[in-house]
Each structure stands twice: as structure tokens, then as C-alpha cells.
């Protein structure tokens, strides 16, 4: 994770476009200025950033299903639950699944775990639109390469 640049996902482990699921890894950094205030003596990953990591995981899934033709933007968070603390240095595994898609919106369910322990979950709604600027598409293509997005999956 690179918290300062909001890159929450380090690597895509599995993308199944038929099942509409994704599994990713996100390594929580050992050191970050975020932990200086959250919380001194007991650093934990902020729930809002855990939610963002689940949203980014869902976003990569949606990009794949839509073959990088439309860009998803987070529109609503429902049923977000923080079930345990996530500490610096821990490895998150995040899974997301598309529950519904249509009329320019998509709903996903996402869960983040450390090992087998569920740490958080949420239902997320996205609005997706054609890429509003070519520079954003170029950026997303570069990020896809960086995190190991299987581009061959969208060329079938």
C-alpha cells in the first residue's frame, strides 16, 4: 500500500470475470505518518482506508468486467463493518464480488481478512461512466500493469 498516493492494492491474486470475483493483496506498511495520529502507542489502520481498499478492489473487478471501457467511481457505502484491528505490517487479502450491475451502477460486496480472520466488510455501490479524460485511462493502464492486472482476461 502507498497510503499517501491512495494506492491501496499491491497485487491481484485472482480475477474471475465469469464468476465476477476478484482477490487481491494489500500489504499494510510498517511505517506511515497516518499511524502517528491513529493512534499513538496503538497504531491501527483507519476504517475509512480499509473501506477504500475494499472499494479499490471492487473497482478493479468492475474495470475488468467492463473491459476497461468505463471507469467506476464509488457512490455509496452500506453495511460497512469493522470487525477487528489491522496493524502496521499485516497483509490484507481482499475479496470482492459483483452482486448487481445495470443502468450505469454496480453493487459489490467486499471482505478483507488478515490470514483467515475477517477484519472488515461492506456493500459498495459504484457509478460507472466512460473515461472522462484520456489521461485517467493512461494512468489506470499503468496501474493495472503495476499490480498485475491480467489484461489478457479482458481481451477474450
Give each language-model segment a name.
Residues 1-3, 67:
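Short aromatic-glycine motifs in intrinsically disordered, low-complexity regions
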Residues 39-46, 50-60, 74:
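Compact, glycine-rich, soluble single-domain proteins
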Residues 21, 88, 99-156:
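HotDog/MaoC-like acyl-thioester-processing domains
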Residues 10-13, 78, 83, 97-99:
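Conserved positions in beta-strands of structured domains
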Residues 6-8, 92, 106:
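Hydrophobic core residues within well-ordered beta-strands of beta-rich domains
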Residues 4-45:
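Catalytic strand-loop segment that frames the active site of acyl-thioester-processing enzymes
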Residues 26, 95-98:
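Short, hydrophobic/aromatic-enriched beta-strand segments in well-ordered soluble domains
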Residues 57-93, 119-121, 127-129:
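Hydrophobic beta-strand-centered segment that forms part of the acyl-chain substrate-binding groove
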Amino acid at each position: 500500500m502507498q497510503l499517501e498516493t491512495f494506492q491501496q492494492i499491491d497485487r491481484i491474486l485472482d480475477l474471475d470475470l465469469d464468476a465476477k470475483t476478484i482477490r487481491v493483496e494489500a500489504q499494510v506498511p510498517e511505517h506511515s505518518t497516518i499511524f502517528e495520529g491513529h493512534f499513538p502507542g496503538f497504531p491501527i489502520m483507519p476504517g475509512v482506508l480499509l473501506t477504500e481498499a475494499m472499494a479499490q478492489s471492487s473497482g478493479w473487478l468492475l474495470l475488468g468486467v467492463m473491459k476497461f471501457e468505463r471507469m467506476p467511481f464509488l457512490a455509496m457505502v452500506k453495511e460497512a463493518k469493522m470487525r477487528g484491528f489491522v496493524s502496521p505490517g499485516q497483509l490484507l487479502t481482499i475479496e470482492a464480488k459483483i452482486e448487481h450491475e445495470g443502468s450505469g451502477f454496480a453493487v459489490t460486496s467486499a471482505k478483507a481478512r488478515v490470514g483467515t480472520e475477517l477484519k472488515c466488510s461492506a456493500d459498495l455501490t459504484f457509478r460507472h461512466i466512460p473515461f472522462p479524460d484520456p489521461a485517467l485511462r493512461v494512468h489506470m493502464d499503468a496501474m493495472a500493469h503495476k499490480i498485475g492486472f491480467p489484461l489478457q482476461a479482458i481481451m477474450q
